[in-house]
């Protein structure tokens, strides 16, 4: 629970470390601890799948270049693909805009016994939408867009996540907390390293202008929606090896919680 945001806790991301803040040996973690964690995670994922009762949703949110894709690759690629599904949520399509903002999220929920991994999520609709005033482009009736719209959405999200938990689908939400300097370095590497050119988008550079606004809104998002049934974890993301290890431990703990000692 070291990185868990407690329900009702006042959150300011400025107060949270972006670097490895544990006294651990990097090479030992990478070669021994991580290997053991992934083996255990594979075992408990198999139990979750065999028991076919609970479903698990892992949400990854972060600033650009915080390591969402790399974390998914290194933590989840060792699991049985029959029981793991990764969904990346990008800008809503025309069809998605014709529905409520949770419609596409509901469609992507995993089956019982499965793990769904959300690369970004419904939280885009309380952060990115606000940063860029995209609510004006939505088809939501204008009389519903008032000063309380964001408080309303937070309530809707809390209610929906509680509903899922009460039906056996548990959500673990992870915010990869990267520093502005580290993000700059990673974006520069995408430009300079030909093997990473495909990752680069000029939009990532433009988004840096809104850094402070994003930090404030992500802080508010975590504060408003970290609950006992659907907690947020704020994970340092400046050291990729450490980030991946911490995420593996968080997911492993969730799998342990929702599996019986042996498959039925």
Locations of regions flagged by a protein language model:
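Pre-Walker A adenine-sensing motif
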Residues: 43-49
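Glycine-rich phosphate-binding P-loop
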Residues: 60-73
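Conserved nucleotide-sensing/catalytic segment adjacent to the nucleotide-binding pocket
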Residues: 89, 96-140
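Conserved small/polar residues in nucleotide/adenosyl-binding loops
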Residues: 258-264
């Amino acid at each position: 629970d070291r990185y868990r945001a407690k329900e009702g806790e006042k959150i300011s991301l400025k107060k949270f470390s972006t670097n490895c803040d544990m006294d651990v040996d990097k090479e030992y973690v990478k070669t021994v601890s991580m290997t053991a964690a992934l083996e255990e995670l594979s075992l408990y994922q198999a139990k979750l799948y065999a028991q076919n009762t609970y479903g698990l949703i892992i949400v990854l949110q972060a600033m650009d270049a915080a390591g969402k894709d790399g974390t998914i690759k290194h933590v989840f690629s060792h699991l049985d693909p029959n029981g793991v599904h990764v969904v990346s949520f990008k800008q809503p399509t025309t069809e998605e805009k014709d529905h409520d903002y949770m419609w596409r999220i509901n469609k992507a929920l995993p089956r019982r016994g499965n793990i769904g991994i959300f690369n970004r999520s419904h939280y885009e609709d309380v952060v990115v939408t606000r940063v860029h005033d995209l609510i004006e482009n939505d088809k939501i009736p204008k009389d519903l867009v008032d000063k309380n719209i964001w408080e309303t959405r937070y309530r809707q999200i809390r209610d929906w996540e509680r509903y899922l938990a009460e039906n056996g689908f548990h959500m673990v939400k992870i915010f990869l907390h990267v520093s502005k300097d580290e993000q700059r370095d990673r974006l520069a590497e995408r430009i300079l390293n030909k093997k990473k050119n495909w990752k680069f988008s000029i939009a990532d550079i433009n988004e840096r202008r809104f850094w402070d606004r994003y930090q404030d809104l992500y802080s508010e998002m975590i504060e408003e929606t970290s609950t006992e049934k659907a907690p947020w974890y704020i994970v340092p993301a400046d050291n990729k090896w450490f980030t991946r290890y911490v995420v593996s431990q968080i997911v492993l703990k969730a799998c342990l919680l929702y599996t019986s000692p042996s498959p039925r």
